[in-house]
Amino acid sequence: MTAAAVPLRPGPGPLPLLLLPLLLLRAGPVRADSKVFGDVDQVRMTSEGSDCRCKCIMRPLSKDACSRVRSGRARVEDFYTVETVSSGTDCRCSCTAPPSSLNPCENEWKMEKLKKQAPELLKLQSMVDLLEGTLYSMDLMKVHAYVHKLASQMNTLEESIKANLSRENEVVRESMRHFSEQLKHYENHSAIMMSIKKELSSLGLQLLQKDAASVPGAPPATGPGSKAQDTAGGKGKDSNKHGSVQKTFVDKGLPRPPKEKLLKAEKLKKEGGKARFPQPTAKPRALAQQQAVIRGITYYKAGRKEMTEAMADNALKGTSWLEQLPPRVEGRLPEPNSAERDEAGGPRASEAADLAPGTPASGPTLTPTPTASPLPTEPPSRPEVPSPGREASCEGTLRAVDPPVRHHSYGRHEGAWMKDPAAKDDKIYVTNYYYGNSLVEFRNLENFKQGRWSNMYKLPYNWIGTGHVVYQGAFYNRAFTKNIIKYDLRQRFVASWALLPDVVYEDTTPWKWRGHSDIDFAVDESGLWVIYPAADDRDEAQPEVIVLSRLDPGDLSVHRETTWKTRLRRNSYGNCFLVCGILYAVDTYNQREGHVAYAFDTHTGADARLQLPFLNEHAYTTQIDYNPKERVLYAWDNGHQLTYTLHFVV
């Protein structure tokens, strides 16, 4: 053990043994952590050796000793020491301390001298002392070692990154070469597939021609209408009427049309024949009427082609309620699309006159006479929305509604999402908010979840509410005015619009959501419906009730025999939906626990009070619509898109 003593000015008095171990530091490879720009370490210890233990003992000068030294009364014990204690086989230790930490008298003497000589340098001296102590406590060699180690690690990391990137680049180049080879193979296969398709199309054409030639009692296949005309009864007037049109396409010596056109013509001919072969011969008028509709599809102008196809499809589907409608009253205001109906109905009226000579012609007035032609006894070949087996399931009533299944969270609090139940695809249509002029289309549910829309329809007007539906390729909605509108999504134009006869609108434009849409469209197994409030003459206290009416999808007309007034009061329910001709109403839209509380049956005209639990998962349901194709409810609840599964009592 070594000790260093610094004597001071001589003074009388005994020497007490005063040892103050203020700091104990154990030596290691490096010294203890020092505080930079903080409190200065009073003792600095350094150690060297593989087996070393060091300890520093500091005995500073007390304040009383300083005062005695200053007054000239110093004692023998007035001194300060720094002792070093070491142990170990291989150890070298050293302890040092700055004079300012051991002898506070020095600082006091310096401060007094500064105050006397240069008072303005007092602040500078204090800063110098602070910097001196800070530099003394810093281990610059240790900082340098850390910086060097960090730099070496950065170099190692840089080299590894370069090596990894080079390997990844090689993988990418190899993948690109592999993909280019696969692309070449795919192009070769594509050429082979195109040649195979051409061969198959030519074989299909030959088979169709052979089938057409093998039909007993049929002339050679010369056009798309020859087979249908023979099946319809072979009347001379009818065949002469369309024979010239057919000869202009095939019989004359014109260049042969492409194979695709021949395939379409043969397919039309085959479909026309299929639509007529199963019909009994005792009903030639109904067959002739259907035949006239098909010819109308074939020979109409291109501008109205899709419109005519939709109307012809409705006629072919054989919806019973459309055929039972009475003749239209002549005093009714003309609808905006009356010219389109005249154009589409012209060929039917003329051909019906040809097939029934005993009936006097009515000139330009087109009055439908559904009682003149018998109804088909067989079920329709193309049902309107569901399969034929689903009509039987409509005999039951609603038994329970399952809790909702959330599919996505999209858009604002209010909105509507829907599918076209008459379409074969899985497109989803969304109207975000309760008024606007946009309809967003998504290819399927997966694209909707990813936010990848495939089409956006900018309507030339503003819609309002959330009671819209998409049905048979058209968007049915209420405009910002009082009109209900059919917007054709294929041709992107307003196909028809109308005013409901007895509807009661709100007093002012609803600039906030009021719980439900005043005009709500619905689609079930029987077709298109509209739900709206109307005046009730039976009760003056509550004059407004909910009316349920079946709509004509073509011209949006309503009829008295397909209109029912319910006892459901306006603003007394949350949302409503229609299933199998039965109207159901949910009692609340902004409470989580709700009930299907009301039902009205259009088949019997009776209503009932129910208590079927209905869960508004997020307590803000702005749309509930039934999809007859999937037999589920589509709902928009506070920006969440949900579906409900239904259970019925058969």
Swiss-Prot record:
UniProt site positions, description: Cleavage: Y300, K301
Residue ranges, compositional bias (Basic and acidic residues): 249-274, 329-345
Modification after translation: O-glycosylated but not N-glycosylated.
UniProt feature coiled coil, ranges: 163-188
Subcellular location: Secreted
Record keywords, A-Z: Coiled coil, Disulfide bond, Glycoprotein, Secreted, Signal
Residue ranges of domain Olfactomedin-like in the record: 393-650
Top-level taxon of the source organism: Eukaryota
Signal sequence segment: 1-32
Bridged cysteine pairs (disulfide): C394-C580
Gene Ontology cellular component annotations, sorted alphabetically: extracellular space
Summary of subunit composition and partner proteins: Homodimer. Binds to heparin and chondroitin sulfate E.
Name listed for the protein in its UniProt record: Olfactomedin-like protein 2A
Source organism of this protein record: Sus scrofa (Pig)
Gene: OLFML2A
